[in-house]
Amino acid sequence: MTVHYISEQNSILNHFLTQLRDVNIQKDSMRFRKNIERIGEIMAYELSKKLEYKDIAVQTPLGVKHTTTIAEDIVLCSILRAGLALHQGFMNFFDDAENGFVSAY
């Protein structure tokens, strides 16, 4: 298994992580949740670089375009409450993915 540290290079991800860690910003729950969602979007984008793709032909108004699309179905699963904002960030990119949730009773 390969581990990728996406926060090692300076990017907007580091800005959002810094805001999550800031005790003053943590008091703003809406901003906190939005930053978690943004981090989910960044993670989804980075993850998309490692997925398998297949070649397809798409009919456009101007003709046929040969391009690629994700080869396999995606299933997103998160732990209820703690992972909901992060899950939403992934759903913003993988909007046709199946969803699963884990909870404890």
Which positions does each model-derived feature cover?
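PRPP-associated nucleotide enzymes
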Residues: 1-105
